[in-house]
Every structure is written in C-alpha cells, then in structure tokens.
UniProtKB/Swiss-Prot annotation:
This is DNA ligase. It comes from Stutzerimonas stutzeri (strain A1501). The gene is ligA. It is an enzyme of class 6 (ligase). It catalyses: NAD(+) + (deoxyribonucleotide)n-3'-hydroxyl + 5'-phospho-(deoxyribonucleotide)m = (deoxyribonucleotide)n+m + AMP + beta-nicotinamide D-nucleotide. It holds the Pfam family DNA_ligase_aden. CDD domains: BRCT_DNA_ligase_like, LIGANc.
C-alpha cells in the first residue's frame, strides 16, 4: 500500500488527468482516450480513495457524474439526479453485484449458477449515445435536458423536439400529470455512415463514432442542424413522476411504450443471475447485427419496491449495473509501419503494434488504409495510438495521443521501391469525376508498377481469379497458388490452363487423385458465364453485382471492352468513376494480352449476344446533350434543343440565329452551346458517343423503329414516389422497352401514373385530371402481363 504522501500525489495526478478527459469528452465533444483507459484511471482513483478516505474531497471525480454543462445553453436542475451506473467488466463482477443485491434484500445467498432465492432483473442493451431527460406536463413535452454532471444539465428543448421518434404529445391515456422520461439519444449505424459521407462530400470533418455524432448533434445551438441529423431516442426509465406507475421496471417501460415512447426491442426479464449471463452472451453474439452501437447490457432489479429498499450510494444505484463488453478501443504503442502490396499494386501501410487485448482478441497489426490516412492522423512510429476492433472488421488506428509522443518518434515514409519485387513505386493522384462539376482531387495512392511481374500482385490476382464467385476452380486454395507462383509455373491467369499432370503432382500435398481432380476443375472452368469472367478479371471497383450488370446489359465481352465511359454510364449504378476504371482496364495493353491468351487456351465466356432491350431503350438525344455537361444547358434546355433540331448533327451545325429560335433558350445558353461545339474535340466526343450508341443498338432512332408495334407504343407514363421492388431507373427502362414514353410531369396527355409511397403533387394532379393510377403491385402485374 502506498504511503499517504505518495497516494496524495498519485490521487492529485489522477484527478487532474480525469478532469482533463472529462472536459474534452463532455464540453469539447472530443474524447482523448478510449473508454477502457478512462475506466482504468477512474477505478485506480476510486481504489486509492477507498484506501485513504481522509484524502477524499467533494471535488473528486468519484463524487459526481461527468462534467459541467456548456455555458451556451440554459441550465436545468434535475429534481431527481441522473446518476450513472456501476460497471461490471468480468463475470465475477456480475456475480458480486447479484450477491450484494441478495444481501441488501436479506435473501439467501445463491451459488455460481444463481440457485437460491431468485431476483428478477430487467435486461436491455446499453446504447452508446447521450443520456437525456424529457419532461412531460399534462402529456405535452415541455423540456429536454442533458444529464450534464448528474445534478445540472443543459436545456436542449429545441433540439430534442426535432428528434423524430420523440412524441411531442403522449399517446393514449393514464399518464401522470408530470412525467420525466429518461432515455438515450443515439445515431443508428446507417444514419452515421450517411452523415459522414455527407460531411466528406461537403469538405467537413467526419465524426469519429456514432456517440460523438449524437452528442455533437444535440449540442448544436441551431436546432435546424440537429433536425438534419438522423437521431433516435430509446427510453430506459423514469425520473420524477406525479402519479401512479406500474410496480416493475419492465411494466414502466411497457407503459412508456403505450404512451408513444420508443423502448428497446431487446428488453427481456431474467429470473436470476444465470439468465442475466445468458442474455449478456446472446446480445454479445448479435452485437454487430444490431442497427445501433452498444457497449454492454444493463441489468436492473425489476421490482420497484426492491429498488427503493436497495437505494443508492454516492455515485450510482445499488439496484442496477452495466455489464460492459470487452473494450473495442484500446491504447498501445506503434512499433513500426510495414508496406503490403495488393492485387492492383496498391502499396498499403500496415501498423505493427505492441500486442494488446481488444474486444477479447490479441491485436498486433492494424490497417492504416493509405498514406493520406497516415497524414490525417499525424501518426509517427513510436506513438501511443488508439486502436479499435469491431466484429470481423480489421483493427484500425483511430488516433494518436500526442502528449505521449516520445522524443525519438519517426515519420512514416513510403518506400521508393516495391518491398516485394523491387519495381518502382509511383504516386497516382485520385480524381473524383462528378456530373456537372470540375474533377477534384480525392487524395492519392501509391502503386508498384511491376504488375504481374510482382509476385505479390500475381498471387492476389490468381487467388481472385480462381475464387468461388469468379472462375470457381475447386481445389486451388491460397497455399497452392503460392506454390504455383513461387515455382514459376504460373505467371498470369492464362498459365493455369497450361498446367500438366507432371507439374501439379510435384506440388506439396498432391497425389494422383488430387492432381486429377485439380486438372479436371481447371478444365471445367473453361466456359464460365460472362459475368463470372468479367468479375474474375479483377477490374478495379467492379464487384460481382457490377459484373452481372455489365454482362446482362451489353451481352458480350467485346462490347464491354470497347464501351466508352460515356456509354457505360447509361447503365444503372455505373457512375463515371467506375466507367473510367472499366474503360482504362480494357485499354491497357497488358490486360488485353492476358485476355487474348485466356481465349487462345480455350477459355470462352458464355455470351448473351445483343444489348438487353431494357438498356437499349435508355439513350435519348436530350439525355446525351445533358450528359455532355455543356455549361448553361440544363435538362429542360436539352429537351427543347432535341425537339427543335431532331438530331445531334443538326444541333452541332446550328448557327447563332438557329439557336435563338429555340423556345426559352437564353442568349447565354445559346452562346455556351455554340462555344462548346466550336471546339473540334467536343464535337468529336459527341459524335463518338452517338456512333457507339448506334452500333450497340442503343440509339434513339433505333428505339423509335423498335417501338412500332410494341404494346405501350404511343403511351406516356409517369413514375412518382418510391418503388420498393426496383429502382426508378429500372421501372423507366422496362416501360421504355415496351414502347412507352416516360415523362417527368403529369398532363392531360398522360396515359398512366405509377404511384409508390411518398407520391405527392403528381398523384394529386393525376387524380384531378382523371388519369389512371396504379400502385406498385398493380404496376408489376401489368408488366408481367405485357411480358416484361
């Protein structure tokens, strides 16, 4: 046991450090250490104060909950303090809690399996968000507040009123005249990912995790910002109540649910500590599948009378405990950074860490993604870093604890030569191509230029090529691929089809039967579907679904290989980024050679032939003009130009006077169009696109000819609202394939309107005009009747 003087010094250090962390966490919304590190510091302080009670002061962090409220908000005094819960980190902590509950209720002690007098506990996940108090008077929401320091919080009434699942007026009847609801406001995982995507798109700083995002959103002085954030409430209890409530915790939560307040769908009653342990294991197993982040489960004595009997201690109720999951964030030392080479040659930094337990697993490596991420984190070799591991996700470094940086820390540098093959490493600037705006820098990537001469790239390329979703060559596992490459038997995917019996049987682990089986599997893969073959090629950004789309839409490898980016983007879900990746892949001489060798050696993907009718009907002259991104020519202007001139050549040839005759085309737009096509490269680009559309059977003139005699020829349809079984683009394509014209507005000439959920003014106008309206199920039935 340390002396009183030594203990006093350590206690002072701990209080200072904890107070600094509290300030960053509660006031600045910028946590500086993981929860697990904070808990260790707090528990050390708590233990020292227990050994030296004479050193306890009212200002100690152990004597209060959290930190002070932000000065920018009004202050709210909690009539019933919002206390935090004690924590259980190990199974024994939970058993000790149950023992203390039994002793407090004067019940017989149970054994390790909970035998003895049974205590009933409510069980629910511990959501990772911000605790709030919602005050209802006569059923109306009158105030919302944060927990703050447990006694005083922040008045965030305007902000909580923007959270969509918080009722502004209680439902039903029987609620107390005054009811204070306690709950957690959190951000679902999907909403968090979408918010961060928007932050990055707008140049903003992404949030570290959903908890920070929820807390930051609720502490906005402008409630309009809060309203734009995907926040939700989960009620978990009641503070003040002027009226009768059920006599169990679960009963109270069910009452809240009846009054319109959301509660956990995972709420459960456990009879005894053994069932609590089973609940903890069950929630832990489904943790990653839940739509929100949790960091443990909460157990509460279910009977309210027993809660009163057990009472409180200084910081927490005696009748509740939070059983935490193993920490998903920890701190450790960055020992080194090594570089790996991926299938496309990308050089990726990998952190080598001092081994640390994270979420129950020893972690010694973590991804750093790329050098832009290294720069963003400001990480150096020797730093103390925060590491996170969640589910099957590769551990990653979240941040650096800068104040712990050693004096001999070293910067991270990309090697000039590939660490595997020694080829040069080149830096490539990534470009984001977006319709209607200039290309902008999206960071950079370092690549080994060795291609398949680099064994790391070759091995990964072969592993991908033979995988189950690609060529599906059974028996060619990673270790066998490594042998084939290391022995020089395979230098490209095409070499697989030249392997002999003599070569294979010499491989480690092979005998006569396994050799015959592997050669048979290779031979059986010579006629893959076109989609499988395209996926197997390993085109950057082309996954299994995109490969299926390319095969279905374009029908042949030759067509896919020759398609211009401006034509590829007519396919649903293929944007400019992916279109350029596909085009660049097939333009590459080396890739063309590998494909030619595969075909020479008997690999023939099974092609479907023509362009699929749904996609053949996608292109229109207005759409082509719109996709050229001519300044000041919007979609409506493109439509009027097409109606006035009828062909691309006529538009290219139109002079100033001709253009000024186009209805409602401004002088600025006419001048911009003329300036655009006066540049030969622009006119050539437009002609090349049109020529390929015509060659592929996707030209609008082909569509008009094909439409003659189709069942919906001459009809005009409108799609409005959300379609749940298909995208709007797919619905449009299927209608156009049947000869219909799909318009963007409803008029007296409209034949039919398809209205999904969320249909608005178009549906109203259709009803006013007496236009036929179909819901989605009727629409699908009509398509089926017409053979689509």
């Amino acid at each position: 046991m340390p002396s009183a003087q030594t203990a006093a010094e350590r206690i002072a250090e701990l209080r200072s450090e904890i107070d600094a962390h509290n300030y960053r966490y509660y006031v600045l919304d910028e946590p500086s250490v993981p929860d697990a590190e904070y808990d260790r510091l707090f528990n050390e302080l708590k233990a020292l104060e227990a050994e030296h009670p004479e050193l306890v002061t009212p200002e100690s962090p152990t004597q209060r909950v959290g930190g002070a409220a932000l000065a920018a908000f009004g202050q709210v005094r909690h009539e019933v303090p919002m206390l935090s819960l004690g924590n259980a980190f190990e199974e024994q902590d939970l058993l000790d809690f149950d023992r203390r509950v039994r002793e407090g209720l004067d019940l017989p002690a149970g054994d390790l399996f909970g035998d003895g007098a049974v205590v009933e506990y409510s069980c629910e996940p511990k959501l990772d968000g911000l605790a709030v108090s919602l005050l209802y008077e006569n059923g109306h929401l009158v105030r919302g507040a944060t927990r703050g320091d447990g006694s005083t919080g922040e008045d965030i009434s305007a902000n909580v009123r923007t959270v969509r699942n918080i009722p502004l007026k209680l439902h039903g009847s029987g609620w107390p005249a005054v009811l204070e609801v306690r709950g957690e406001i959190y951000m679902p995982k999907a909403g968090f990912e979408a918010l961060n995507a928007r932050q990055l798109e707008s140049g903003g700083k992404p949030f570290a995790n959903p908890r920070n995002a929820a807390a930051g959103s609720l502490r906005q002085l402008d409630s309009k910002i809060t309203a734009s954030r995907p926040l939700e409430l989960c009620a978990y209890g009641v503070g003040r109540s002027d009226g009768e409530l059920p006599d169990t915790h679960i009963g109270i939560l069910q009452a809240l649910k009846g009054w319109g307040l959301p509660i956990s769908r995972e709420l459960k009653l456990a009879k005894g500590v053994a069932e609590c342990r089973a609940y903890y294991d069950a929630i832990g197993a489904k943790r990653d599948a839940l739509p929100y982040e949790i960091d443990g489960v909460v157990f509460k004595v279910n009977a309210v009378e027993q809660q009163r009997e057990l009472g409180f201690r200084a910081r927490e109720p005696r009748w509740a405990i939070a059983h935490k999951f193993p920490a998903r964030e920890e701190i450790t030392e960055l020992l080194d950074v090594e570089f790996q080479v991926g299938r496309t040659g990308a050089i990726t930094p990998v952190a080598r860490l001092k081994p640390v337990q994270v979420a129950g697993v020893t972690v010694s490596n973590a991804t750093l993604h790329n050098m832009d991420e290294v720069a963003r984190l400001g990480v150096m070799i020797g730093d103390t870093v925060i590491v996170r591991r969640a589910g099957d996700v590769i551990p990653q470094i979240l941040g650096v604890i800068a104040e712990r940086r050693p004096t001999d820390a070293r910067a991270v540098h990309v090697p000039e030569q590939c660490p595997v093959c020694g080829s040069a490493v080149e830096r490539t600037q990534l470009i984001k191509r977006s319709k209607g705006r200039e290309s902008v820098s999206e960071g950079s990537i370092y690549r080994c230029v060795g291609r398949l001469a680099c064994q790391a790239q070759l091995k990964q390329a072969i592993i991908h090529f033979v995988s189950r979703r690609a060529m599906d060559i059974d028996g060619l596992g990673d270790k066998i691929v490594e042998q084939l490459v290391d022995k020089g038997l395979v230098r490209s995917p095409a070499d697989l089809y030249c392997l002999t019996h003599e070569q294979v049987i010499e491989l480690e682990g092979f005998a006569e039967i396994s050799t015959r089986n592997l050669l048979h599997a290779i031979d059986a893969s010579r006629k893959p579907s076109l989609a499988r073959f395209v996926y197997a090629l390993g085109i950057p950004d082309v996954g299994e679904e995109t490969a299926k789309l390319l095969a279905r839409a374009l029908g042949s490898l030759d067509r896919i290989g020759r398609a211009l980016p401006d034509v590829l983007v007519y396919l649903p879900d293929v944007g400019l980024e992916v279109a350029h990746e596909i085009h660049s892949f097939f333009e590459d001489e080396h890739n063309r050679t590998v494909i030619a060798l595969l075909r020479e050696r008997g690999v023939e993907p099974q092609e479907q032939g023509d362009v699929h009718p749904e996609f053949a009907a996608c292109a229109t002259l207005p759409d082509l003009l719109d996709r050229l991104n001519i300044p000041h020519i919007a979609r409506t202007g493109a439509q009027r130009l097409a109606e006035r001139f009828g062909s691309l050549e006529a538009i290219i040839a139109a002079d100033w006077l001709d253009l000024r005759q186009v209805e409602r085309l401004t002088e600025k737009a006419a001048r911009s169009l003329r300036d655009y096509f006066d540049k030969p490269e622009n006119a050539e680009r437009a002609r090349l696109i049109e020529a390929q559309l015509r060659e592929f059977g996707m030209h609008w003139e082909s569509e008009r000819k094909a439409a003659e005699g189709l069942p919906l020829a001459g009809q005009t349809w409108v799609l409005t609202g959300t379609l749940e079984t298909m995208s709007r683009d797919e619905g449009k394509a299927r209608l156009e394939a049947l000869g219909a014209k799909v318009a963007g507005s409803v008029s007296a000439k409209t034949t039919c309107v398809v209205a999904g959920p969320g249909a608005g003014s178009k549906l109203t106008k259709a009803n006013e005009l007496g236009v036929t309206v179909l819901d989605e199920s009727q629409f699908i039935e009509r398509l089926a009747q017409l053979g689509s």
